[in-house]
Amino acid sequence: MRVLIKNGTVVNADGQAKQDLLIESGIVRQLGNNISPQLPYEEIDATGCYVFPGGVDVHTHFNIDVGIARSCDDFFTGTRAAACGGTTTIIDHMGFGPNGCRLRHQLEVYRGYAAHKAVIDYSFHGVIQHINHAILDEIPMMVEEGLSSFKLYLTYQYKLNDDEVLQALRRLHESGALTTVHPENDAAIASKRAEFIAAGLTAPRYHALSRPLECEAEAIARMINLAQIAGNAPLYIVHLSNGLGLDYLRLARANHQPVWVETCPQYLLLDERSYDTEDGMKFILSPPLRNVREQDKLWCGISDGAIDVVATDHCTFSMAQRLQISKGDFSRCPNGLPGVENRMQLLFSSGVMTGRISPERFVELTSAMPARLFGLWPQKGLLAPGSDGDVVIIDPRQSQQIQHRHLHDNADYSPWEGFTCQGAIVRTLSRGETIFCDGTFTGKAGRGRFLRRKPFVPPVL
């Protein structure tokens, strides 16, 4: 199968050019002008459009069981939504397994979830929910099998203490893996939450008040220091929501510490006022939405390079689930927002089209740096000969209003309802195959491939 994309502006993280792009047998074969491929081939006219590498979303939660509920997107509906939003690769954060389970247990479970459902290519982050000799011995074997990043939690049921974190950091570093972490101070949150519940203060706004930014920032600072103690172990902070935590990361980077950070569209574009709306329960996620001042600080990090990745933390629970389970109490509400379909369009509209970032920086945030950090470069995140033919075509001339009824996930609402975006995803190709075109999903379940990722190699800081 040959596909020739003509007349578009091809953009990579290191530059852009108006040129044509030839994909053959799922692989980029040639870029340039006046390409004359052998017949037969499909021709796609991208006049006036940007031709970007397909998005790489390194933070999703599909089919996750959080005890009180299972998310309503499985690996078909979740990756279908991703494809329709220009994302061609996801790395899913696996949920917790049974108490005392081995690392391999959850990998086998999740490979079963995805095998016949995923529309796009996928991998997983391991999850370390307890520490013992068997777990530590498993890590290098898992890395050899293509799982080169693992997540630690400082909050929730399987939070690790500082000694366990140090053991994990050391072994992951020795094994060629990147440590990712959900950083929030669990004890401080539990104390604040108990105060509010005792006082009968259970409305959605108290979710945010029970998890102040200092809880997140303290945990970030602690992880930075523990990583240094563990031999300068590489560290990746997920879903950053505030400027104080970013300040700590800037300081670590200035001291040449190997730390990287992601944020998400919700922390750039939504704020804590959402909790005071009639549907405030739909915005329950952790860390919570912050104020506009924190948004501005994050946008500075997006613009000046301090933030490395924009992912989604897509974790969808329906409003029916939220209301039935919570009964109006924030502390009982399952956490998470949908967004895997909207990430690329929202960042393009609010970043590129406003002049906050260049098209090249857009690529760096949404595909190139995620691919580099998580062992997929140059197969993913790049349009060059030999790379996978993963492409998203965006037309900057089109304006669209986000409406849930036009989205492809399995949620019954969108936090982005009514947002107007300048720029539209008009086509998505995965390994040269069109899986979304002009509003219509054309992919199929099970075509996605499991990606064995390379051991961690730090990009140049």
UniProtKB/Swiss-Prot annotation:
Binding site for a divalent metal cation 1: 59, 61, 151, 313
Keywords: Hydrolase, Metal-binding
Positions bound to a divalent metal cation 2: 151, 182, 239
GO cellular component, one term: cytosol
SUPFAM superfamilies reported in the protein's UniProt record: Composite domain of metallo-dependent hydrolases, Metallo-dependent hydrolases
Keyword Flavoprotein included in the entry's annotation: no
Record flagged with keyword Cell division: no
Family matches, as CDD domains: D-HYD
UniProt-annotated binding residues for substrate: 156, 286, 335
Catalytic activity: D-5-phenylhydantoin + H2O = N-carbamoyl-D-phenylglycine + H(+)
Cofactor, how bound (note): Binds 2 divalent metal cations per subunit.
Names of required cofactors: a divalent metal cation
EC annotation from Swiss-Prot or TrEMBL: 3.5.2.-
PTM section of the record: Carboxylation allows a single lysine to coordinate two divalent metal cations.
GO biological process, one term: pyrimidine nucleobase catabolic process
NCBIfam families hit by this protein: D-hydantoinase
Similarity field: Belongs to the metallo-dependent hydrolases superfamily. Hydantoinase/dihydropyrimidinase family.
Protein's name according to its UniProt entry: D-phenylhydantoinase
